[in-house]
Amino acid sequence: MLSQCFRSSLAKHCFVAKNQALHGKFVNSIMCLSSSSSNSGSSNSNSNSGSSNSNIRYNDNYRSNDDGTNFEELQLPSALKSETESLNGKGKNKLSKRPQTLLEALIESHGTLPEEVDEPKITRNVASESATSATSATSATSATSATSATSATSATSATSATSATSTTTIITTTATVPVENNVSTPYWVKRELTMKAKHSQWNPKKKLSREDMLKLRELKENFPHYKTVELAELFRVSPEAVRRILKSNWVPNDIDEDRIIARREKQKQKRQQEIQLKKLEFISNRGKKNVSSRPQQRQQQQPKQQQRQRSKVGYKNGFAFNEKYGGLGNKF
């Protein structure tokens, strides 16, 4: 790179001094500088920054016009300025002396040739780039995850707080507000539910007789320390039934009692007669077949069954050894 810079800058100088007599000397100086620059360029690969540190910008020293003959002076050292002025015939030294070569001008200005600054080689390491990209990605993801985690924790805390408050409010409301029946339930289910809700307390498993009710009252009068729950377990009824019996003002009447006793006796006799009739019918229907005591419908059906059986080939009611059975000719 440094050799290319020297060559480009010196080519411009050679273009200016192509009609001068010292063209050969410039060519020699170019060869010297090119050899020195090639040797120095082999030691260090990056030389753009080194050439900038030497305060000599060979690429940007001159700016040429369209025809390439005239150049503008931009930034040059004093030695190079004098050289260019002597070559172009503008300065005090109008070829009065032998013009200095570029190598001599550089030696005068710097004492020695500008040494290249050693800079670290910029080599593209794919592994390091991938590592840096990975670290940057992990840092970015960690940052995003941290922010998301913080936001998630804040959101969860907020939601938990709101849910806690909502649960507390729900508990308080459910404790006070009664539960309404579901609209989708049919009317007969609602009716049963309402009846159970109304009459759940008054739901005795059996009805007590008047004698039992009198006994219950006597027990409570003689033993007041008995509780309603204990009396309900003793008579096998609900506690509410015991409470209503004790609170009622019913008093048994002798006339009513005689009437009730007579009615019960009649019901008992009727029930016994029905049981005896059922027994007689069962005994009468249990007789042999084709008996006159059997119903008429059964007498008409029995001969038909016998005719069907006798119509079969080799019909016999039973079978015996060494005889045909069922027309199959098998002998047993």
From Swiss-Prot:
Keyword Magnesium: no
Pfam families, per the entry: Neugrin (PF06413)
Biased composition (Low complexity): 37-55, 130-166, 293-306
Chain segments carrying region Disordered: 37-70, 126-166, 285-316
Keywords for the protein's UniProt record, in alphabetical order: Mitochondrion, Transit peptide
Cell location: Mitochondrion
GO cellular component: mitochondrion; nucleus
Domain of life: Eukaryota
Family: Belongs to the RRG9 family.
Biological role stated in the UniProt entry: Required for respiratory activity and maintenance and expression of the mitochondrial genome.
Protein name: Required for respiratory growth protein 9, mitochondrial
Annotated organism of origin: Lodderomyces elongisporus (strain ATCC 11503 / CBS 2605 / JCM 1781 / NBRC 1676 / NRRL YB-4239) (Yeast)
